[in-house]
């Protein structure tokens, strides 16, 4: 893979030019262009660019790797959460809008948001009537129940995706083993379907943000008769506006209009392109070139352009760019189950050793995010500004790090391994900068790269693999599952979130006090009161030194002037909202 790094001097100069320009432009709040892509830089952050209902054409996405899965019940990449809504309608979703409006949860397959009862421990939803799959059969509440069962209670088959519903729904006695092992018609008793258009969820405790939780694709319907486990991804049946025409693993997916989709029971979707093509495993520089040449339209992964492209765009003051934030943190997880990181002093030594400015520069400089010191990003409600491991100018403190290495019984340092995703050059560059920082205090780091599509299912997200291979450090980016402190923190710091595969609590943190604070807080119906507690949880996590915050992620997109309805949605980590993108 080609290196995407440029010298720090060239990059910083380009960033300085761009920041000066963007301070003058202010963006296009109306989102209106002249039809030739003349909207200002950041126009899609503050508005909708080229709003249009024009139909037709083939919309082309490209990705630098294969996703973990297009199966809505077996994915945990944000871009698939975003994209899957085209063919899998969850009960709720986020409004396709910029700014604060984009963080609002709205009904999708459900007629309205949920009706809580039993103090918030029971939630009832009514499904829209007349919603049909691509084969013409009608969607029922039993299909939604089955979708939840297969995605949350069959982790040996579907290892990816959040585990909230498995954690918080009341379990059967004896324990429910999922639909592939439990062949009973009743299934999970805590999900009731009194009729074809009503579904009731019964939880172990009150859960104030349940509407947000159901915005993930695990609440999309899957008819039991059509499911064949791991092979379902090969012939997904659509409940959305588009359906799969073909899917070739590691090559491409092609979607066409679902002829049975009805705008009358779907107020969110427009069904604009004739066809949608997703090309997989395309080199990032090639993606950037294709976007600029008009040969493709969107980088579906949404991690931003390569550094060389970034420098060119910023130096030329290209207006077809969006520099967006979206509740996301770039960090390094420290594995508490791999020695010597089972000792908190050794973890703290790493915290002090890292030169975060060098890491930030390796990732692309300030335009890609400010240096971070907390787990909660600055745009998540409940964020509190603090720095537990403050160092001079954020460039590390070698003396303090060596002092802590001595305290943890490693005065001469030690060897460990750090993982990064091999299709993400910026992530590898950051790992390289960390490697250099740790070398200064005697910690020798080997960088091990793995494919993004298998990063959680086979490698970094498999505790046994990380322990067997003595992987002590793991590069990670995390965007909130929904824009609250709980939606950000729970799956990365709660002990119950640790899984055998598809694990996202990479540090394997299991602190009873932190677990209890999260559980107790989500039961509180007062949002302001919940927000206050999340800052306290953040501080306790940082005291454990299991996460090294690196940058508060910002993305630099190239916005194709050929697309319509371009809007950067913070709910999708600043990605363009894929629900209604069309072509001029």
Q: Model segments located where?
A:
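A bilobed periplasmic-binding-protein/Venus flytrap-type ligand-binding module shared by bacterial periplasmic
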Residues: 94-95, 256-260, 326-349, 353, ...
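Structural transition elements
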Residues: 242, 367-407, 422-429
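Ligand/substrate-recognition segments at binding pockets and active sites
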Residues: 283, 406-480, 553
């Amino acid at each position: 893979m080609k290196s995407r790094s440029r010298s720090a001097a060239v990059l910083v100069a380009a960033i300085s030019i761009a920041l000066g320009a963007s301070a003058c432009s202010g963006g296009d709040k109306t989102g209106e262009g002249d039809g030739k892509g003349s909207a200002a830089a950041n126009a899609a952050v503050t508005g909708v660019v080229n709003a249009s209902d024009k139909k037709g054409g083939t919309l082309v996405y490209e990705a630098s790797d294969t996703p973990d899965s297009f199966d809505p019940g077996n994915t945990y990449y944000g871009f698939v959460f975003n994209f899957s809504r085209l063919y899998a309608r969850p009960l709720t979703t986020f409004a396709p809008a910029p700014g604060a409006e984009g963080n609002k949860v709205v009904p999708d397959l459900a007629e309205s948001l949920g009706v809580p009862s039993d103090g918030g421990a029971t939630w009832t939803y009514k499904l829209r009537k007349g919603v049909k799959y691509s084969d013409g059969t009608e969607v029922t509440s039993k299909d939604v129940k089955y979708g939840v069962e297969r995605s949350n209670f069959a982790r040996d088959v579907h290892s990816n995706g959040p585990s909230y519903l498995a954690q918080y729904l009341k379990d059967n006695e004896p324990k429910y083993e999922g639909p592939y092992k439990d062949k009973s018609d009743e299934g999970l008793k805590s999900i009731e379907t009194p009729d074809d258009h009503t579904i009731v969820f019964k939880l172990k405790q009150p859960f104030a943000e349940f509407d947000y939780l159901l915005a993930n694709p695990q609440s999309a319907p899957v008819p039991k008769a059509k499911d064949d486990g791991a092979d379902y991804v090969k012939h997904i049946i659509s409940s959305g506006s588009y359906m799969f025409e073909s899917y070739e693993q590691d090559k491409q997916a092609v979607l066409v209009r679902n002829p049975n989709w009805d705008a009358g029971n779907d107020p969110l979707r427009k069904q604009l392109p004739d066809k949608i093509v997703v090309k997989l495993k395309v080199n990032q520089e090639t993606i950037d070139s294709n976007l600029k040449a008009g040969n493709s339209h969107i980088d579906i992964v949404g991690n931003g352009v390569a550094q060389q492209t970034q420098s060119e765009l910023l130096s030329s003051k290209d207006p077809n760019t969006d520099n967006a934030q979206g509740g996301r943190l770039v960090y390094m997880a420290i594995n508490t189950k791999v020695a010597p990181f089972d000792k908190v002093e050794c973890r703290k030594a790493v915290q002090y050793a890292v030169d975060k400015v060098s890491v930030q520069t390796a990732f692309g400089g300030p335009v890609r995010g400010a240096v971070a010191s907390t787990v909660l990003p600055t745009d998540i409600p409940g964020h509190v500004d603090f720095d537990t491991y403050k160092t001079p100018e954020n460039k590390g403190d070698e003396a303090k790090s060596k002092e802590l290495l001595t305290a943890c019984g490693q005065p001469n340092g030690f060897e460990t391994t750090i993982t990064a995703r091999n299709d993400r050059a910026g992530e590898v560059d950051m790992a390289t900068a960390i490697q250099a920082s740790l070398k200064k205090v005697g910690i020798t780091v080997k960088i091990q790269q793995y494919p993004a599509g298998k990063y959680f299912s086979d490698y970094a997200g498999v505790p046994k693999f990380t322990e067997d291979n003595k992987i002590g450090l793991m590069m990670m980016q995390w965007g909130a599952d929904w824009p609250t402190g709980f939606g950000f923190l729970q799956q990365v710091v709660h002990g119950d979130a640790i899984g055998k595969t598809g694990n996202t609590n990479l540090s394997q943190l299991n602190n009873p006090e932190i677990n209890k604070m999260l559980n107790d807080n989500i039961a509180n119906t007062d949002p302001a009161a919940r927000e206050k507690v999340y800052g306290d949880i953040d501080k306790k996590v940082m005291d454990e030194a299991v996460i090294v915050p690196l940058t508060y992620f910002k993305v630099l997109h190239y916005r194709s002037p050929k697309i319509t309805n371009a809007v950067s949605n913070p709910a999708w980590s600043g990605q363009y909202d894929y629900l209604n993108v069309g072509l001029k």
